[in-house]
Every structure is written in C-alpha cells, then in structure tokens.
Amino acid sequence: MKAAGAKQRGSARGRRPLVGKLVIFGIGLIGGSLALALKKRHAVARVVGVGRSRANLLAARRLGIIDEIAGDPALAVQDADLVLLAVPLGQTAAVLAQIAPHLGPHTIVTDAGSTKRDVIAHARKYLGAAFARFVPAHPIAGTEKSGARAAFATLFDDHKLIVTPEPETDSRAVRKVSTMWKVAGLQVSTMRAADHDRVYALVSHLAHVLAFALVNQIAGYADTAALFGHTGGGFRDSTRIAGSSPEMWRDVCLANRDSLLAALDDYLEELELLRGMVEASDGRALEARFAAARAARTKMAGEKKLKRKDAEGAKTTKQA
C-alpha cells in the first residue's frame, strides 16, 4: 500500500473550483458528505443529484447538499466533469449501463463501493473506451446511518481512501479523483483490487456480518425483550454497525463472496478453538488467547491513536 502524499485541503474562494459539475448517483451518507465537504471548501461549482427516492433528493436539495435534481440522468452526465457512483453495489452495473452511451469525451467516472473487483468488471463491460477514465475508489469512512440527512461535511476528515486503478486507467483521472477526495479530508493510498477485497473482507465485511449475527442471535430467544433490556456498553459497541443498511451489506456480502467466505471459515476456526477451551475449563489457555488479542489490538495502530478512535466510536454510539 503506497501513501499518495499529504492531504490537500481547500480551494480558495474566487479561484476556479476543482470540479465544475459533479453528478452523484446516490445522495446518502457517502455521496452527500462528499458534496458537503467539497462545497465547504469551495471545490465544486455545481452538484447534481440522482436517486431512486424523490423525497430523499428533495431533502438533499433543501439541506444544500445538491444544487439540482436530475430530471434525466442521461442528460445530466453529458456535460459532467465527474460522475460519482455512491449507490448500493447491486445497482452499480445498471447505472453504468445507463450512463455509458451519454458520457462526454472527458468525463471521469468513479465509485465509492466497498468492493472493487466486481465494480471494475462491470465498468470494463459497459464503459467501453470510457473505461480508461473510470477510477475505482473506496472511502474508508462511514457511520451506521444512511440517507441524505445522515450526511455531514467532516465525515472524511483524517480517514483513508483506497484507489485500485487498472493498468489502462488514465493517470490524469486518478490524480483528479485522488485530489477531490484529499480536499474532502481523506488520505489516499493505492492497492490492487484483489488485495483490497481480501483485506476489507477481513477487517470490515466480516465485522458487519458478525454484528448482524449477534443481534439476530439475541433477538431469536423467547425472552428477547428482557435480554435487550440488560445490554450494556459492550453489546452496544459490538453491535452498533448492525444498524447499517441491510441492502448495502447484502450487496457487499454477495459481491465479495469468496473473500468473505474465507474470512468466515477462519473465524469459525477461532470460535471452535475458544469453545474447546471453555468446554475444557482451560482458564490458562483462555487468558493467554485473550491476552494475545489485547496485545494485537493495542499494537494495531498505537495505543494513543486507538484510544482516540475508541472515543470517537463511543461518541457515535451515544448519538445513535
């Protein structure tokens, strides 16, 4: 993974904005927050929103997230400088097929999907010559909330963006997209798409599946109301992300099927190991296993940085 330089913040008022016309498909947490971040830094001239929910688009316009609602998506992309796909992964192929014949000769297309190999395959299939101007990207930021009302301008501050360009991807398009996200607050790194999908199956997708599973387990007992009445901070912290969009995470699981299955198999092995220790009343082995996990977590990003992230997570949990 290669760092792509320091963050670039701001576009001074009065200068030509970085992006002239930005068309966003999907005005939710990610698409809406990007629009707000760019507007805050005067880095975009006009934002056009496209989406399935008229009510959500109207809310986005009322909140100042977008400047206009696209009447015809095909017409909207014709003179766009940049098109962002921030829709659930299951909609990506259909959107690419819809816009491909109408893209301008210099329009850059990018996405914000949590998986990359499937998105790249769809883009290669539908975009034709415009595939060279498609920049696969994944902002590593978010909350468990969704929709335009969930968007906020500082969502991306001090988080990562992963770009996974293909050999034929235009380097100028990569620079443009990378700069846009840097302005929004992200630090940009580059990975191979296959490496990205394996890594995020392990450190993100698996965690969401486990959170959904834990909530469903408790909800499945006859005394579920009483059980939920006794939950404390540990349960809430472990399951906060189970409040995320079911549609989005259904699509992520299916799109990253092979990598996620491998991650689940490894996790089941770890559970079997722990179960065996509990069954054998092997306290020494349990403590050693827990201590190893604690040490690994502390080392993960440095204790000070980890405490800051924990504090941010606790704050988000209180707001949820």
What is the role of each PLM region?
Residues Q98-R149:
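Rossmann-like NAD(P)(H) cofactor-binding subdomain of soluble oxidoreductases
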